[in-house]
A protein has these predicted regions:
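Internal anion-binding site segments
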Residues: 106-194
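Donor/substrate-binding cores of folate-linked one-carbon enzymes
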Residues: 2-114, 118
Length: 194
């Protein structure tokens, strides 16, 4: 069987009795093991990430790799990366040899961590760092700041320097869609009009 984002550790007995088991992990293992591989890759300004299918063993995200697919993530939002990987996997799964000998994971091991609400705050950040967090956390967060004394979640932004903006420490951010505290998703321009 294949599992994805199962967030559980199988017992050795379960693995033995149900072998082979495979996991799809949304990074190019052994890089970005753990719960937030897509967000961490974007947060760290990686240009490429992808997904890995590996044989499940008793340790977390360490089994032999049977397939990897590299994708360009430069400038993308996490939700776009998830969609890109999902679409790629739907095609690739038809041609994956699940019974070949896997490759042992070596070198470049890195781990991810769980992100919390404070991680999504862009209030005191530079423009570039705020944009990075908005892209990395659009699915998990989203990024937010205090604006007119309320929490304003920023879903995305424009690179075009036109329209209404929010002043950050070193530049202007041009939000497109926001979620004001206690309200639904709306255009930033509509929010400003009240």
């Amino acid at each position: 069987g294949i599992v994805a984002s199962f967030a559980k550790i199988f017992t050795n007995n379960f693995i033995t009795n149900n072998s082979p088991l495979f996991n799809i992990h949304l990074s190019l293992l052994p890089k970005y093991k753990g719960p937030t591989p897509v967000e961490s890759a974007l947060f760290n300004l990686e240009n490429f990430s992808g997904y890995t299918i590996f044989k499940i063993n008793k340790n977390i995200d360490t089994g032999d790799i049977i397939y990897q697919k590299k994708v360009n993530i430069e400038g993308k939002y996490a939700s776009e990366v998830y969609q890109q990987i999902y679409e790629s996997f739907q095609i690739d799964i038809l041609n994956i040899d699940f019974y070949k000998k896997g490759q042992i994971q070596e070198n470049l091991v890195s781990n991810t961590r769980k992100f919390f609400k404070d991680d999504f705050n862009i209030q005191e950040l530079t423009l570039q760092n705020a944009k990075t967090k908005i892209r990395a956390f659009d699915y998990l967060g989203p990024a937010f700041l205090k604006y007119n004394n309320i929490n304003l979640k920023i879903l995305n932004y424009s690179e075009m320097e036109q329209g209404s903006s929010i002043e950050l420490s070193d530049g202007l951010l041009y939000p497109l869609y926001v979620i004001p505290e206690g309200k639904s998703k709306m255009l930033f321009e509509d929010y400003l009009r009240g």
